[in-house]
Amino acid sequence: MTLKELEIGKSAVIKTVGGEGALRQHFLDMGVIPGAEVTVIKFAPMGDPMELQIHGYELTLRLADADQITIEQISSRTRKHEGARNINQSVHPGLGEEGKYHVKGDGNPLPEKTRLTYALVGNQNCGKTTLFNQLTGSNQHIGNFPGVTVDRKDGPIKGYPDTLVTDLPGIYSMSPYSSEEIVSRNFVLEDKPKAIINIIDATNIERNLYLTMQLLEMDIPMVVALNMMDEMTGNSGSVDVNGMEAMLGVPVVPISAAKNEGVDELVRHALHIAKYQERPGRQDFCSENEFGGAVHRCIHAVSHLIEDHAEHAGIPLRFAASKIIEGDHLILQKLELDENEHEAIEHLIVQMEKERGLDRSAAIADMRFNFIEKVCEKTVVKPKASRERIRSEKIDRILTGKYTAIPCFIGIMLLVFFLTFHVIGAFLQNLLAMGIDALSNVTDRALTAAGVNEVLHGLIIDGIFAGVGSVLSFLPIIVTLFFFLSLMEDSGYIARVAFFMDKLLRKIGLSGRCSSDLDVQFRR
């Protein structure tokens, strides 16, 4: 039985994940791994794609991809995701942690005036841009990463001119699946920031920690910012911050970027770890005894074989070893291994696959999610569904419903165009036209009274005011349309449009994600 055949509301355990290449690795990174429990929430109005719940969060999958995933249907849950119910309510320690919860720096700070560079990394929709704005204020530089159209934003931390924070694109892993992931990985590996600020959505820790584990493997000083803690605690959730620090080996700071709470403490930690180069205290997430220790032995053996190559290529050893086992061809190219080394590593990986009972990519992903589950069980009490989320789910039933999604979309777009071209936009357009006409009349009388040459007079009145004025008359329409479409995008409606329009757009060679690009074309 495949995942495509699973009915709405039914649960199953994933047995195998088909496919190959970067797309399959992307699914594994998102938690679609053998042994994981998955529940079908709904199908798009056109029947494709489908929305799933896995590891406590929602995921959208096309039916063609779901057809490559075999499952075993179950009647009860097999994995617990509720987290601990009685966690330690310890007081969060002070600056630098004094080496209590992660490896303390050697006490030799970087030279004075050294520019402290930071990579701000996190999943999409975790509040990363809000935090970046809180850190840098209005002092930002916006551009593109070299060779791609991915936006790049840089700016110094307010009050600290010798710092520079780079806001990397929102990503879910450091695998080379999308241009955003490639750009982010290359920035960390090649630009070598002094430290990483990893922002996590506290209401969805399980999903966010996968990227955190990959960042820890890069052996760069790092501080974790638990964002949206106000929502977490406001809905009866909590996090044992000290316990999480002890398990991750890096400082963890609870914040609310939207309310500017905890940001000052985050800045102090970020400055401290960068200045003293306090590297993560943990990079080994697989137990020697777990599943016979097959993955543990393989990672350490591969690390030993590639140590010199990784150092020469400037790639963190643990990260390189994990990526080689996963089959990351870009990392393999950079290491420049000879044929004998390739054969030795392949022998180790094949042996691990036999002992573990999973293929190489799935074994590494499963190792990470097993550790994440342990962290959440020991340190996290998941919040209850907030009133906002319950209200959002009710609205979703209408906006993405089988029989209501398309009519709602047509109705909303008609309303937007009506308000733009006949109400708000038209009113502002008439107001601007009246202003231009009034200014033109005043200027006309002034030029006539001054006896200005007729040619110059005609150029100003008939050329500038009439010509430029007619072009400017479109500005209110454009601004109004931009406002409404931005409102739709910020509210999350465009993402919902991508969900139910994906099948239709693919018939003309596009994907559902292009709905946001079509949105931009409307703005133009």
Q: Model features per residue range: what roles?
A:
Residues M1-K80:
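Compact, glycine-rich, soluble single-domain proteins
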Residues S90-S173:
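Conserved G1/Walker A P-loop phosphate-binding module
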Residues K158-Y160, V183-V252:
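Conserved C-terminal guanine-recognition region of P-loop GTPase G domains, centered on the G4
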Residues M232-S287:
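Canonical P-loop GTPase G-domain recognition
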Residues R282-D359, A363-E373:
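Long, well-ordered amphipathic alpha-helical subdomains in the mid-to-C-terminal portions
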Residues H347-V381, S386-D396, N430-L472:
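Interfacial loop/helix-cap signal at membrane boundaries in integral membrane proteins
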Residues R387, L399-F409, C514:
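Membrane-interface helix starts
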Residues F421-S516:
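Membrane-embedded alpha-helical segments and adjacent helix-loop junctions characteristic
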